């Protein structure tokens, strides 16, 4: 009897031992599966790229796939939000987006200074408005400065934050257009800029705002900057204080009446480039930054348009660091050569950036 009891106890212990081993093996299996899942999760997380706002402009956060209805808006908003650290532009979805601050016109509090200020032109200003001339060797890329403005004039430009050339240590170029938008070339020009993903600055006057607001809206929608070119394209160097206000503030008022959702207008270019310290100071009091140019050519005579290939060669010979290029859209030559010109400038190692890149 004792023998059978002992055998029963021994058999029962064996069963418990086997059950315990099974339980341990099962628990080990569960831990292994859990560990594998954790490792897989960590590996997946490493593949998610999240940009730091300090890493650069225009780099987007990698997001889960968005719906068609909201993806473009969300990406544009993300890019605009990332335009920080002193930058007011970003690049997203093949175009530039801007986060412009409202312009301050606090300088109007001291507008009385303008009544007694001299309206004389700069001593070194010729009949046309060029701040200097450069010649580039297209084989070596070496740029020679043929002539430049006087030290006094350059100091005056700097005093009022006037743009005529960007950072001369960087291979970068800025495209600007003046007037001539009513010659039927704008759709082609905008198509080319969109294809090449280039942002330009368009300085507009009152006639164009009134007659072609749809084209201006397209410029805004496709990542371009709109600048103030005054209402009537007068020479502003000798006008009265009231006339200057009517021309410059009047253009802005017309602009917002026509396009109430347009972004702030920050840049001003004097009609025909006619300029003196009085104009620069007045524009500065209105909160504008005046934009001139460091390269242009005679492209505005619609009855004597230059050859495309010769003009491309001229463009490349004049190419220089920080170049602010002036083009007129009424030019058939410009319209035809624009795409090739952009390619050649980039092939030479230059970036083409929005004018707001200039600090």
Predicted regions and their residues:
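N-terminal secretory signal peptides that target proteins for export/translocation
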Residues: 1-25
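Short stretches within intrinsically disordered, low-complexity N-terminal or propeptide regions
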Residues: 10, 36-38, 78-82
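Serine residues within intrinsically disordered or low-complexity segments
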Residues: 10-13, 19, 32, 44, ...
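Sec-dependent N-terminal signal peptides of Gram-positive bacterial secreted proteins and lipoproteins
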Residues: 27-48
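Alpha/beta-hydrolase fold active-site neighborhood
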Residues: 30, 56, 230
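N-terminal pre-catalytic segment of deacetylase/amide-hydrolase enzymes
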Residues: 45-175, 182-187, 195, 350-359
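Catalytic domains of cell-wall/extracellular-matrix polysaccharide-remodeling enzymes
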Residues: 102, 188, 210-211, 234-359
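Active-site beta->alpha N-cap acidic-glycine motif
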Residues: 135-237, 243-265, 357
């Amino acid at each position: 009897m004792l023998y059978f009891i002992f055998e029963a106890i021994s058999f029962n212990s064996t069963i418990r031992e086997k059950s315990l081993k099974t339980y341990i093996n099962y628990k080990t299996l569960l831990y292994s599966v859990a560990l594998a899942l954790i490792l897989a999760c960590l590996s997946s997380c490493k593949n998610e790229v999240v940009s730091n706002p300090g890493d650069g402009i225009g780099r987007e956060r990698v997001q889960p796939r968005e719906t068609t209805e909201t993806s473009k808006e969300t990406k544009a908003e993300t890019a605009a939000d990332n335009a920080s650290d002193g930058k007011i532009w970003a690049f997203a979805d093949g175009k530039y987006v801007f986060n412009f601050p409202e312009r301050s016109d606090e300088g109007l509090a001291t507008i009385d200074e303008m009544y007694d200020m001299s309206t004389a032109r700069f001593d070194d200003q010729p009949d046309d408005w060029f701040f200097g001339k450069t010649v580039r060797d297209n084989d070596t890329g070496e740029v020679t400065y043929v002539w430049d403005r006087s030290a006094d004039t350059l100091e005056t430009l700097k005093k009022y934050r006037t743009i005529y050339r960007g950072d001369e240590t960087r291979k970068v170029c800025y495209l600007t257009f003046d007037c001539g938008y009513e010659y039927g070339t704008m759709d082609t020009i905008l198509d080319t800029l969109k294809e090449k993903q280039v942002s330009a600055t368009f300085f507009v006057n009152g006639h164009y705002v009134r007659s072609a607001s749809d084209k201006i809206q397209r410029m805004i929608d496709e990542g371009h900057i709109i600048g103030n070119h005054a209402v009537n394209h007068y020479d502003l160097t000798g006008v009265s204080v009231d006339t200057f206000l009517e021309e410059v503030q009047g253009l802005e008022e017309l602009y917002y009446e026509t396009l109430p959702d347009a972004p702030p207008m920050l840049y001003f270019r004097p009609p025909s480039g006619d300029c003196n310290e009085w104009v620069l100071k007045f524009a500065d009091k209105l909160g504008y930054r005046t934009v001139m140019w460091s390269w242009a050519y005679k492209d505005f005579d619609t009855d004597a348009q230059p050859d495309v290939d010769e003009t491309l060669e001229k463009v490349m010979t004049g190419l220089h660091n920080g170049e602010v290029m002036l083009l007129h859209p009424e030019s058939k030559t410009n319209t035809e050569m624009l795409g090739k010109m952009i390619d050649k400038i980039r092939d030479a190692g230059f970036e083409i950036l929005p004018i707001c890149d200039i600090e």
